[in-house]
Amino acid sequence: MTRPIRATLDLAAIRHNYQQAKACSPESFAFAVIKADAYGHGYEQVAAALAVWPTVLPSSTSSRARTLREAGLRQPILLLEGCFDRAELEEAARLQLTVPFHAAHQFDWLKQGSLPAPLEVMLKLNTGMNRLGFRPDEAPRAAAWLQARNDIRLAGLMTHFATADGDPGIAAQLSRFDEVNASLGLPSCVANSAALMRHPASRRQYVRPGIMLYGASPFADQSAAELGLRPAMRLEADIIGVQSLQAGDAVGYGATFVADRPMRIGVVACGYADGYPRVAPAGTPCAIGGQPARLVGRVSMDMLTIDLTSLPQAGVGDRVTLWGGDGVSIDDVATAAGTIGYELMCALAPRVPRRVVGA
């Protein structure tokens, strides 16, 4: 018998969420961001699920892009981080990938000779995130250098917002971007999920929804359900033991939770080795049969404990929803643990059995 824990990945929900993204900006060409193994949802199956739309599938590594090409995917693929050396740049050209150019050292690779095939490039502009990208004063020269190459097609100008999900918003960064592009006149790619949903000025020729595709909210003050998004990942595990406590009894490592009254505690077959956050505190929500419950005690490597006192019918073998259904969102758990839904999705461990629905 396999360990009683499972993750259900809903491809129909991802398609629905992609359509929600498209509805925000119907005239834009919508990237579907599948970096980090499609935020833990499996990049090959997500790419296949979205293949009915003419979209761009950003990937962080050329090896994964190669896998998609070998699987027959012919849509444009953008390497979000760009290439890491000349050899990868040559492979990107052979695979017909789109590559961001973000720093001067990448031009040194081009100086080594012509590429084996024409390469589509986007110029990345650093407008204030201070991660990757040319400074605004460097961008015109970089663009001119690329446009002078016979083996390069400069397809657009892109940037990334640091605070699209809150204050101070995108105005300052977008102003820097537009000032540069006023002279370049390139197609623009600036909107992530948060910008796409809240900042109409960011809806340009290209948009790139990421976290919203997987049914989590990019905002702290608005839930995924309020945004019309459906959860694409549901994590569940079974109760494998029950303990009856008296007042004063402690639960788990460090005895961090002490019962203040008689209680029933359920032991659940999920722990931090499965990707559940060890820092999730007592009170973190879960559900049993649609009824709300909460964690007590410290999350262990393979197990966690929940309060069954108000659920006398619950016992061994009952399924616990840890996130993604029954009123418990991944954002609820992330907030309780002091992190974000992105991290929980990406941290789901390989040992957790996956079940794919909605294909």
From Swiss-Prot:
Highest taxon of source: Bacteria
InterPro entries reported in the protein's UniProt record: Ala_racemase, Ala_racemase/Decarboxylase_C, Ala_racemase_C, Ala_racemase_N, Ala_racemase_pyridoxalP-BS, PLP-binding_barrel
Key word Isomerase present: yes
N6-(pyridoxal phosphate)lysine: modified positions: 35
Record field: catalytic activity: L-alanine = D-alanine
SUPFAM superfamilies linked: Alanine racemase C-terminal domain-like (SSF50621), PLP-binding barrel (SSF51419)
Active-site feature positions: 35 (proton acceptor), 253 (proton acceptor)
Protein residues bound to substrate: 131, 301
Pathway: Amino-acid biosynthesis; D-alanine biosynthesis; D-alanine from L-alanine: step 1/1
Record key words, sorted: Isomerase, Pyridoxal phosphate
MF term (GO), any: pyridoxal phosphate binding
Chain's role: Catalyzes the interconversion of L-alanine and D-alanine. May also act on other amino acids.
Protein name: Alanine racemase
Organism: Laribacter hongkongensis (strain HLHK9)
